[in-house]
Amino acid sequence: DGSHLSFEDNIKLTKQVVEYAHAHGVTVEGELGQLAGVEDEVNVEHHSYTNPDDVVEFVTKTGCDSLAIAIGTSHGAFKFKPGQNPQLRFDILEEVSRRLPNFPIVLHGASSVIPEYVKIINENGGSLKDAIGIPEEMLRQAAASAVCKINIDSDLRLAFTAGIRETFVKNPGEFDPRKYLG
């Protein structure tokens, strides 16, 4: 992921990855624009939207197979502040799709942060105050466009954590992972 680099350095890095990966039969997802939030214990406080003027040059010069764009999503379970109205920049998505017709577009940081999982976690000893994600209707709108993949890692982590916390509260003496992970 070279999205934190300058445009030129992102192209250079992504092209190197593409050349190596394609030689080994592996596809590559490039990324333009930077998402805020926490990913892999790295905290990025500021985001930058994908500039549609850059996408054709980036895809052409790198040879990437799909492109992750930044339209207002962010990593982690705390994407928005309470009372904040989540807004995704569908105008950017539409313009990118117009400039790259039939090219696979990806959204990173698009977990909906399912309230039921947050509730289970909090009811079973967790503390996820004000965890807010992307509204499902916005994800459905994105999926109906050129978006072919929506990354929802935080939702998977929340579901797993909710299940584990609930299991341990109901079965406090359990210590055999085969019984609670199997």
Task: Give the ranges of each region predicted by the language model.
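C-terminal alpha-helical cap/extension of soluble enzyme domains
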Residues: 123, 134-182
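Short catalytic/ligand-gating loop segments at beta-alpha or beta-beta junctions
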Residues: 107-112
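Alpha/beta enzyme core
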Residues: 1-104, 115-132, 136, 140, ...
